[in-house]
């Protein structure tokens, strides 16, 4: 939907996304000359940042989007109407729109894995994740930087992507986004 607002409607304004969202929005922001702000996970962080920056769109990994001029909260109806308008104005099917986006910013892939672990191991698991430092190799990729705003986001060198590890508050559960 951000691609539609930028490309078809010609709108310009900040974009707000969560740490767990992919980096397509960063590439769109760079391409169209608009700032992209990253927040903690959840609309409790997205909404205030949208108001603060007068953002044109804000969203999170789960598919929730909010839009300038509307309540800064997830609005699936408006998001779907905008997507339908994108299809009508371009005459393209969703698969063709996705290909158009990939043509602009390159193909992107995303996954989230939720993994349970024994609750008595919470501290040791957290310590192992926290022990990762820049320069360490994970899965053949070198960690360039780490953002601990909301979990542990490992950004890999040479634009090779990122991996966010978040611990569930009440459950012995790790959420891994990449």
Region locations from a protein language model:
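Phosphate-binding and adjacent anionic-ligand microenvironments
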Residues: 7-178
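Extended, hydrophobic alpha-helical segments in both membrane/secreted and soluble proteins
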Residues: 1-2, 25
């Amino acid at each position: 939907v951000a691609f539609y607002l930028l490309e078809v409607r010609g709108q310009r304004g900040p974009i707000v996304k969560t740490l767990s969202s992919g980096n397509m929005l960063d590439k769109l922001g760079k391409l169209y000359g608009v700032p992209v702000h990253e927040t903690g996970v959840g609309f409790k962080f997205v909404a205030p940042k949208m108001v603060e920056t007068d953002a044109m769109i804000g969203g999170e990994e789960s598919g929730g989007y909010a839009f300038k001029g509307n309540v800064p909260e997830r609005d699936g109806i408006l998001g779907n109407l905008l997507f339908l308008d994108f299809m009508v104005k371009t005459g393209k099917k969703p698969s063709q729109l996705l290909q158009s986006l990939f043509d602009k910013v390159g193909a992107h892939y995303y996954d989230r894995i939720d993994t349970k672990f024994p609750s008595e191991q919470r501290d040791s698991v957290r310590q192992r994740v926290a022990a990762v430092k820049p320069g360490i190799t994970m899965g053949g990729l070198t960690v360039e930087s780490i953002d601990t705003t909301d979990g542990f986001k490992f950004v890999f060198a040479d634009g090779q992507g990122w991996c966010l590890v978040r611990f569930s508050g009440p459950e012995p559960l790790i959420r891994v986004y990449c």
